[in-house]
Amino acid sequence: MAGSKIALVGCGTVGGATAQILERDREFLSKRTGCALELGYIVDKDFAVARSLGLNEALFEKDLDTALADPDVSIVVELVGGTTTAKEITQRALRAGKHVVTANKALLAHYGVDLIQHARSNGVTIAFEASCGGGIPIIRALYDGLVANRVEALYGIVNGTCNYILTEMVNRGERYEDALATAQENGLAEADPTLDVSGLDSAH
């Protein structure tokens, strides 16, 4: 079975959960994909979240270049968020000939076209299904399954965090602050929820 070593960059709420899944379900994912997936690096400046989750400290790496220089790393998962640092990380990974997976819709909204072209010119892929709909496979359906259709409208929940908060406020009479705190406790909102609750995430 062919193998793919993964460098996960950014170990916050989403990154930590992703690392846990990659470690916990390694055999299951390898069987389902036909590819031996291995989490090789967790790259971040601060490993407080990673340590709190009990992740393997042997995987911790502060220097992205170390991960990119590893010839066994074929996939970089970008979970830093924002656009500036995330763009730099993504470009560096693509230049190094690594496939990139990102859930960063802000990055894609601002630089998606350029990054996709950059990936193609380096013979690799940038995958971003996780950036929309909580990973529901809608992007591939639109790109592949509906390629011959004229899509005139899409309806759905624009932001899961806001949807949760508003549902709690309407159905349970929760105060905004309490609903937000509960969302954060349940991993449905980042420690800094500004991007979600300001409407910027929805705009992206």
Q: What annotation goes with each model-predicted range?
A:
Residues H99-V101:
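A short hydrophobic/small-residue beta-strand
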Residues A19-Q20, S52-L55, G112-L115, P137-D144, ...:
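Short acidic, glycine/serine/threonine-rich loops at helix termini
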Residues L22-R26, A119, L146:
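Active-site catalytic pocket residues across diverse enzymes, especially alpha/beta-hydrolases
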Residues C11, G15-T18, C35, T83-A86, ...:
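Generic structural signal for well-ordered, non-membrane alpha-helical segments
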Residues M1-R95:
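N-terminal glycine-/serine-/threonine-rich beta1-alpha1-beta2 phosphate-ribose binding loop
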Residues L79, A103-A106:
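Catalytic beta/alpha-barrel core
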Residues R120, T125-H204:
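Core active-site phosphate/anionic-ligand binding loop and the adjoining beta-turn-alpha structural block
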Residues A86-A96, K105-Y143:
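Rossmann-fold NAD(P)-binding glycine/threonine-rich loop
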